[in-house]
Regions:
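Post-signal-peptide, soluble extracytosolic/periplasmic N-terminal scaffold domains
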Residues: 2-12, 16-271, 581, 586-661
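Short, ordered, surface-exposed loop/turn motifs in non-cytosolic proteins
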Residues: 49-58, 62-73, 684-693, 765-780
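Feature captures outer-membrane beta-barrel proteins of Gram-negative bacteria and organelles
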Residues: 157, 186-199, 219-233, 368-382, ...
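Exposed, low-structure sequence patches enriched in small/polar residues
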Residues: 463-465, 487-760, 766-778
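Short Pro-Gly-centered beta-turn/loop motif in secreted/extracellular proteins
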Residues: 78-87, 311-317, 703-729, 741, ...
Length: 836
């Protein structure tokens, strides 16, 4: 009986591996002529061929490493041959083994870089799982160091490669107004985010340029800093311009040095709350978001409700000031409260921050006063947390003490009090005090998230550090407004989200109220959003209200309500196309209705949308507006454009965005880099999709970038094997990486580039090559291929001509080959080789 597929050997190996509880005997005579010279003893005893295998190293079922491991043929205590891995003492230590408790590990290893004797650990076992390419290490728990759950072992943390990287984004818009006085407005916005990685050090900068109308362009640097992780301290060291943490005091922009705990290095069951900016645009509008005086986000949105989730906020508090620049020249301004949740730490956990430097205001005319800050939080018994801090600066001192606690299923609560001593420019010394209560609860069972913060200002002289330092200016001008002179008496912010499942939808509520001292009235801001899925479509209702106190004691109040519905048209179009309708109704009139069709094409690389809207109270002929939007997600970046037209105005806009990484292999262009980045390397495999992201493909060298990796956790980077070129094969389609904060880590795929061939081998005397013989392509890295029962071997990555080495037992021979002129079926060469 003849076997046509070289996969037979792998099948036998799999049977042997899976049947380790039973004894199987393989009869060599069943292989026919191919049995000559075949030693089946290793197969009969369930053992693979010795050699080097690339495997995932698993300790008690958890991956701790991926590497090439040398396996040697040894005998166990019963004299049975086994494959034993060569692992060094230093490797075992990195895998979490308490090597210092087992001196016998060093019996065979004179240095930490030689093979250790794993039998020195009682009941420890090492098994090669050839089917899954895993080395399974079974280590008793008493021989392992305690480990944190939720993050990868520290031995796997990868600081990445030296690299220069930069994000870029730009947008330009031209608006022509046709009614009354004809005029043209041009606005442009550019943001650059360059960075350098050297070892654990990260150097980062964010610089933006903005021009609007007739005003000249203005550059603004949001920050420039260098930082690195101090892993033994579970902390980060920052030098330069950044913003202080906002868990105890309000966030403060500074230039100086900061040493602070890094929560990402220590797993929490819950991560820090991330804000979402929700609003409603009456027209196609530009939305600008500022935090602590700096522009952190700038984009264009379609008419109707919007939700901005990609905000690069500081990891701290600070309200988000949102401005919506409508196409008709009007503006909306509102504030999204953003505060950190209540403080509640696990018992024994210490969290700290130390800061010294100069105050860095967004206004360049503000004096750069010296500042210092220290904060400390510590988890006490009985689910309590004590915390406190001090702030000191020219003309300002503050101290804060607080106590927080975990209430179990009822959430977390913290209360603190602060005392300040300050003097604004040109004013007398003031003393003040405030109390703050924070409550947060996240109920996974009911899908509820709730955050509440209440400030009570006990006296009129209370000021924050920014209030005081912003009053000192070196240009001689004192900026004053009647609102700056108002003293708040209390402030409350609320954030609530509730999920009711697929059919009832999701509800979110945000709100804030500020009461003023010695003046009646208050400022209010509320937002309500509800959305659900209906028959494959989506329905959402949004409402926003902003109520602002004016100088004369009156209030300016504006409500906006929006209803939106979307329905897929798949059953008619056969692809990803949807139709939508939305109605936007401001309280001061100007109700707008809009219908649109949007979809995707070219494997989701092209996004397109066509809209038609009507505004009821617009001037004659100006109520109808037509709009077109296109966006291309390319391998080398993002490109978008939009066009809208009505009898009153015409607007055109173009935007681009992308990321650049310069590394030891050259320059790689890709889509914008977010967070830690994987540099995918699949040499010779160009145009292969990576990670399932639209448009993310390898370039002409086989390189690309994938961002948004989870830091200090295992991430899987995948190639789409169905899109590989005909002359390319990969030995694995998944690579796992564990990046540190801001790292550029290599995700290397082992590729074989060249021809594929099925070669029949013969010896000089005409006899067949034995079954199971190893065939190595000389000059090619990677594992050997195996000869099947027909003396055939499947080879990949072949050059036009070359040499093969064939080994079996103690014998070997060589084959010189030259590819035929024509390929066979499935682009596979059929050829013969004489082994000498």
């Amino acid at each position: 009986m003849k076997f046509k597929h070289p996969a037979l050997l792998l099948f036998i190996a799999g049977v042997v591996h899976c049947a380790n509880a039973h004894a199987y005997t393989f009869d060599a005579s069943m292989l026919g002529d191919a049995a000559k010279g075949v030693d089946m003893s290793l197969f009969n005893q369930g053992v693979q061929q010795p050699g080097t295998y690339r495997v995932d190293v698993m300790v008690n079922g958890k991956r701790v490493d991926t590497r090439d491991v040398v396996f040697k043929l040894e005998k166990d205590g019963q004299g049975t041959p086994v494959l034993a891995p060569c692992l060094t003492v230093s490797q075992l230590s990195r895998y979490g083994v308490k090597t210092e408790d087992y001196p016998q590990l060093w019996k065979a290893a004179k240095t930490p870089d030689e093979c250790a004797d794993l039998t020195a650990i009682p009941q420890a076992k090492a098994v090669l799982d050839i089917n899954n390419q895993q080395l399974q290490l079974s280590i008793p728990q008493v021989a392992l160091r305690p480990e944190f759950k939720g993050i990868a072992p520290e031995a796997l943390w990868d600081d990445g490669i030296p690299a220069f990287l930069m994000n870029y984004s730009a947008r330009t818009t031209q608006t022509d107004y046709k009614m009354d006085m004809e005029r043209r407005d041009n606005s442009s916005w550019v943001q650059l985010q360059p960075g350098i990685n050297i070892g654990a050090w990260r150097v980062r900068n964010a610089t933006s340029w903005q021009r609007s109308g007739q005003l000249s362009g203005k550059w603004q640097a949001a920050y420039t800093y260098a930082e690195r992780g101090l892993y033994s301290l579970k902390s980060r060291l920052t030098l330069g311009q950044k913003t202080s943490q906002g868990e105890i005091f309000d966030s403060v922009p500074f230039t100086g040095v900061m040493l602070a705990s890094d929560d990402n290095m220590v797993p929490y069951s819950e991560r820090q709350f991330a804000p979402v900016v929700r609003g409603i645009a009456r027209t196609q509008a530009r939305v600008e978001v500022k935090q602590n005086g700096y522009t952190i986000y700038n984009t264009t949105v379609a008419p109707g409700p919007f939700a901005l989730r990609e905000l690069s906020v500081t990891d701290s508090s600070g309200d988000l000031h949102v401005t919506v620049w409508e196409a008709d020249g009007s503006t909306q301004m509102f504030v999204v409260p953003y505060q950190t949740p209540a403080i509640a730490l696990h018992q024994g956990y210490l969290k700290y921050s130390l800061l010294a430097g100069r105050y860095r205001s967004s206004d360049s005319a503000t004096d750069k006063a010296q500042i210092a800050q220290a904060t400390l939080m510590y988890g006490l018994p009985w689910n309590l947390t004590a915390y406190g801090g001090i702030q000191s600066a020219t003309h300002y001192q503050a101290a804060l003490l607080g106590l927080g606690g975990s209430l179990g299923r009822w959430g977390s609560l913290s209360v603190d009090g602060s005392d300040t001593h300050s003097q604004r420019q040109g004013e007398a010394v003031q003393q003040g005090a405030s109390w703050r209560l924070r409550y947060s609860n996240q109920l996974a069972a009911t899908g509820t998230n709730f955050f509440l913060t209440r400030w009570q200002y006990a006296s009129q002289g209370y000021n924050t550090l920014s209030d005081v330092l912003d009053s000192y200016r070196h240009d001689g001008n004192r900026l004053w407004s009647w609102r700056e002179n108002l003293q708040p008496s209390s402030r409350t912010t609320l954030m609530l989200s509730q999920s009711w499942g697929r059919h009832l939808g999701n509800l979110s509520l945000t709100g804030s109220r500020t009461d003023w001292r010695n003046r009646p009235g208050h400022d209010d801001s509320y937002g309500l959003s509800w959305g659900t899925s209906i028959g494959g479509g989506s329905l959402s209702l949004n409402w926003n209200q902003n109520r602002t106190l004016w100088r004369n004691g009156a209030h300016r109040k504006e409500n906006i309500t929006s209803l939106w519905f979307s329905m897929p048209l798949r059953c008619w179009t056969g692809n990803n196309v949807s139709a939508s309708w939305q109605m936007t109704s401001p309280s001061h009139g100007g109700q707008t209705q809009q219908v649109g069709v949007n979809g995707e094409a070219f494997s989701q690389q092209l996004d397109w949308e066509v809209r038609q809207s009507y505004r009821a109270d617009a001037p004659p002929g100006g109520g109808n507006n037509s709009a077109l939007h296109l966006a291309w997600n390319g391998a080398y970046g993002l490109l978008g454009g939009d066009y809208s037209y009505s009898r009153a105005m015409r607007q055109m806009g173009v935007n681009i965005a992308g990321g650049i990484v310069i590394h030891h292999h050259g320059v790689t262009l890709g889509q914008p880099l977010q967070g830690s980045v994987a540099l995918v390397e699949a040499p010779g495999a160009s145009g292969v999709p990576v990670g399932g992201w639209p448009g993310v493909k390898t370039d002409f060298r086989g390189d690309t970038t994938v961002g948004n990796l989870s830091v200090y956790q295992e991430n899987t980077v995948s190639l789409d094997p169905s899109q590989l070129p005909d002359d390319a094969e990969v030995t694995q389609t998944d690579v796992r990486v564990v990046p540190t904060e801001g790292a550029v880590v290599e995700a290397k795929f082992h590729t074989r580039i060249g021809a594929r061939a099925l070669m029949t081998l013969k010896r000089e005397d005409g006899s067949a090559i034995p079954f199971g013989a190893q065939v190595i392509v000389n000059g090619q890295d990677g594992s050997a291929d195996l000869v099947d029962t027909d003396s055939q071997v499947y080879l990949t990555g072949l050059a036009d001509k070359g040499e093969l080495t064939v080994k079996w037992g103690a014998q070997q021979c060589r084959v010189n080959y030259h590819l035929p002129a024509h390929k066979g079926i499935a682009s596979l060469y059929q050829m013969s080789g004489l082994c000498r």
